[in-house]
Amino acid sequence: MRADSVLARRTALLLRDPARAAETVARLTERGACAAVCQLIDFELPADTRALDASLARLLAGDFDWLVLTSVNTLRALKHRAAALNLRLMIPAGTQVAVVGEATAAALRELGARVDFMPRHDHSARGMLAEWEQLRAGEPASVLMPQADIASATLRDGFAARGWAAHIVIAYRTVPAPGNPHLALQTPVAAPDLPAGSYLLEPEHLPGASGRLDAVFFTSPSTVDNFLARLPAPPAHLALVAIGDSTAARLRARGLEPAATALFPTPDGLINAWEQSLRADLHPPR
């Protein structure tokens, strides 16, 4: 723990399942902070996977110039369906792959696949459109983009404006936790042990626990909506930290001003944003 950490003895609320929150918990612990882990959303495969399965078959047949992956979950959905269909998920030699950020790139490399494009600066749909040289060159291409049921239209509209033929298919659904285990996007894993001071928080206990929290980390617009469904009027002392611009925009649309927005959509990005906001406007830990 850093002795001078402004985060010491403060607690951040993480709205993810414990396994996915583990890295953020570890990073907070290194800086002397604690975490309350409260899973509000879950991810399911579509009840009808025929469209996804057909898109997967076309991908494996080499029908697309590009595969666009905007989250680790989209890759998980492809892997799940490939396994269910007894297929090997591999990227054809003639298909290039674009990813939104480092987490998705790392998951892709675990498959032994390459990453042909990832934005350097803005790890978002907007950043992809701004930095994608082949897209900006204007030469038409075919794209497969599996995505969430609540994904924004940013990439779809960007492809259409540049004459690219985008085949968009729903790969997974975002639902309140817990989701249907029969449609689970991945096999549940045991919750990791949490360090001293950090704890699991059941969603129904969130309103009563809010006074003991110092910050909330929002990792998607849907986490904003599900949090506010449980706690419509967050206490004024809570620092609302957004993982990116679209999440910050959702907070503002709901009448709340983010205390900070992460420069990078990573655990360190969120924690750094929170820390910088505290240094700018110091408050005693609650």
Residue ranges and their predicted role:
Residues M1-R286:
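Conserved beta-alpha
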